[in-house]
Amino acid sequence: MKLSFTKVSLTNILILFNCLFIIFSMIVLTFGVIPQIYLLKFANILHGVRPSIFPIVCFTGSFVIIVACVGIIGLMKGGKCLLTMHIIALIIATIIDISTATLSAIKQNEFLTKAGQVLNDSSKLYYKNRLYATEFDLMHITFKCCNVKNDYSLLGTLHLIPESCTHGIEFYKQQCNEPLNKYVRYYIDILIYLCFIFGFIKLIYSLFTFTQRQRIFSEKTPVA
């Protein structure tokens, strides 16, 4: 009965780890989805600019949930082929996560620069595009910033600084890409830590499971 207990215990531990991977992936998905939903409020003036880590972790998070379910089925049903596919897929997802987190850590100012360029271009259409004006007003009020300057139209009419750029008699002097980047960096930093920490856990799990796969499927449960 000792062999049977060892096999059952090992299988249960691996199943537990896969359940934890599902929970972890849901957490990663949450931190990847929330900022993207928020940035949709400014989708037009940002022209879809967003940190690449957000859509990537959403994809890998969803992918890992499926992979973990496949692993659980493989462990419960004794499917060696399923478990092998599970290990390979998990390693691929882990490599993608760690690579993305590394690049995001290196290119910390990438979104700041791109957002600044796009917002400056979009601000020129503030008085020409109602939708742009609405999104800029929301951004100004939310982040206490201003990206629209005094401007003369083709007819020589002076466009004053928008009311959304003011607070009482004071004007917001800060460019909007800076507070927007601060908001985005909060989620990026969390995702970087999560990707590294849980990425290494998944990598260790994958290597351990790979080395133990023969033991999992070769031991036979004695008949009582």
Swiss-Prot record:
CDD domains: tetraspanin_LEL (cd03127). It comes from the Eukaryota. Disulfide bonds: none annotated. Residues 1-12, 74-80, 211-224 are cytoplasmic. It is found in: Membrane. Keywords: Glycoprotein, Membrane, Transmembrane, Transmembrane helix. Glycans are attached at residue 120. The chain crosses the membrane at residues 13-33, 53-73, 81-101, 190-210. GO terms for cellular component: membrane. It is a multi-pass membrane protein. Residues 34-52, 102-189 are extracellular. InterPro entries: Tetraspanin/Peripherin (IPR018499), Tetraspanin_CS (IPR018503), Tetraspanin_EC2_sf (IPR008952). PANTHER family: LD03691P (PTHR19282:SF452), TETRASPANIN (PTHR19282). Belongs to the tetraspanin (TM4SF) family. This is 25 kDa integral membrane protein. It comes from Schistosoma japonicum.
